[in-house]
Amino acid sequence: MSVIKRALISLSDKAGAVEFAQTLTKLGVEILSTGGTAKLLADAGVPVIEVADYTGFPEMLDGRVKTLHPKIHGGILGRRDLGEHVAKMEEHGIGNIDLVCVNLYPFAATIAKPNCTLEDAIENIDIGGPTMVRSAAKNWKHVAIVTDTADFPAIAAELEANNGALSDKTRFNLSRKAFSHTAQYDGMISNYLTSLSDDVLSGEPQIGEFPSQFNQSWIKVQDMRYGENPHQRAAFYRDVYPAAGSLSAYKQLQGKELSYNNIADADAAWEAVKSFDAPACVIVKHANPCGVAVAADTLTAYKLAYATDTTSAFGGIIAFNREVDGETVKQITDNQFMEVLMAPKFTAEALEIAAAKKNVRVLEVPLEAGANRFELKRVGGGLLVQTPDIHRISRADLKVVSKRQPTEQEWNDLLFVWNVAKYVKSNAIVFGKGGQTYGIGAGQMSRVDSTRIAARKAQDAGLDLNGACAASDAFFPFRDGVDVIAEQGIKAIIHPAGSMRDQEVFDAADEHGIAMVVTDVRHFRH
C-alpha cells in the first residue's frame, strides 16, 4: 500500500467535503482543488492549492477548461512502477496525484427542471470531471478515485488506520464504482439527447417519451437464494434514481431474507395499496390481489380483505397504506400464515407482536406519491418499454349507457372495484360492495370464465352478491359475462366498452335492470 501524498478534490455534491479534507490535511496530504470546492475548503481553514496555480494555466472558456492539463492527467495516469513513466514525469515537472475526489455536474437535476432548455442541458454536461474519473479509475493500482461523498467516512477511517494508505481491494472497488458512475452519467445524457425531436436547429426541440437508444443503470441490492424456481439464479437490483414511494426503498424490520417471489408479490401489493386514499388493506398471492378493502382503520380493512378469500390469503403478502397497530397484527397472526407484512409504519406494539412470528418479513416502505417513469418487460432479444398504468378516474369521467342510473352507493362501489381491477391479471373481473371485494376472477383466457370464478369465490366466502357491483378490466366481447353477473344479483357494472357488440352488452344490462357505466379506459395487465 502506497501512502497518499497529494489529492485533487473537485465536487458538485460537496457533502462531507470539509471534514474529509480536514482528515487528509492531518495526514499531511497536499490538496488541489477548483472553483467552488476550493473556496469551500479555504473558507473552512483547509490549506488548498488552486489547480490554476498548480498548473500555471488559468481556468478559461467559462470554466470549460480547468483540469484538462498534462500536469493533472499525467499526475493521475502515470504508472509509478514503470521507470519510463517516472522519468518523463520528472522531466516535465509532473507530480503524482494519488487520490481524486470528483463527482459530476448535476445533469439529472438539470433536465428534471420543467423549463430546462437544450442549452441548459448542454452546459451541464461535465467534460473534465469524467476525464479525471476515468483516468484515476484506469490507474487504480496507484490512484484512488472517490465519486460518492457517502464513501468519505469509510475512506477517511481506512486512511487513518493505515497511516495515509488505502488497500488494493479498496482502490479496485472504488475504480469499479467510478466506471459505473461515468457509464450511468453518459447513459443519462444519451437518453436525453436521443429523446429530442429532430428540429434541434430550428428552435427548441421537443422531448419525446422514448429515446432512440435506451440506457438504464441498476445497482445490485442483494443476491437471492434462487429465482422464481429453485433451479434459477437471481439477484435484486434497484434503479439509480428510483421513483418516490417505490418498493426498493423498503426497510426490513424482521424476518427471513426476501425471496424473488416475495419481492415480486410485495411490489404488486404495494402498488395496489398505495393507490387508495382511504385506509386500505391488500392481500396478494402470486402477484394477484385475492382480497382488498378500504375502511376507517387498518383492523377493519384487514378483516374485510381477508374475508374475500381466506384460502388464497394463506401464505400471502399483506400490505397497508397506514400505520399498523398491535390489534391489527394480532388479528392477522391469529387468522393466518403470511410471508410478508408491509406498511408505511408500525407501532411498537405491532412490532412486538410480529416478533413472535420470527420468519415473517416485516417491511416499512415510505408512502409517497410517485411512479416509475417506465415499465420494462424483456422479450427474446428485445425490451418492451411503456409508461406505467397510473390512470385514475372520477365519477365525472364515467358515462352511463344503461336506462337505470347507479345509486350513490353504487357510484362509490363502482369506483372501488374499478381501481382494484387495475391490479388484477387479465382477464380480470372484480365484485365488491361497501369498500370490500366480494370475489376476484383473475388471469383467465376468457372473460366469462373469470366472471364465473369471481362468483364462485364470493359463494365460497359466504358473501351475498345481491346489490354488489362488478368491474371488468376490458370490454365484454359477448353478453354472456353480463348474464352471469346478473345471475348473482349484481346491480351495477363498470367496464371500458369498445367491443363490436357493445350495444348487445348494453341491451343485456337493461334487460337485467343493471346500471352500466363505461370508462373508455382499459386496464389490461399481463
Swiss-Prot record:
| Gene coding for it | purH
**Any idea where the MGS-like domain is?**
1-147
Which CDD domains does the protein's record reference? Answer: IMPCH
PROSITE patterns linked: MGS (PS51855)
| Alphabetical list of Pfam families matching this protein | AICARFT_IMPCHas, MGS
Name by which UniProt lists this protein: Bifunctional purine biosynthesis protein PurH
- Pathway noted in the entry: Purine metabolism; IMP biosynthesis via de novo pathway; 5-formamido-1-(5-phospho-D-ribosyl)imidazole-4-carboxamide from 5-amino-1-(5-phospho-D-ribosyl)imidazole-4-carboxamide (10-formyl THF route): step 1/1; Purine metabolism; IMP biosynthesis via de novo pathway; IMP from 5-formamido-1-(5-phospho-D-ribosyl)imidazole-4-carboxamide: step 1/1
Report the SS bond pairs: none
Which family does the similarity line name?
A: Belongs to the PurH family.
A GO term for molecular function: phosphoribosylaminoimidazolecarboxamide formyltransferase activity
Q: Could you say which EC number(s) this protein's record lists?
A: 2.1.2.3, 3.5.4.10
- Species of origin reads Neisseria meningitidis serogroup C (strain 053442)
Q: Which GO terms describe its cellular component?
A: cytosol
Q: What is known of its domains?
A: The IMP cyclohydrolase activity resides in the N-terminal region.
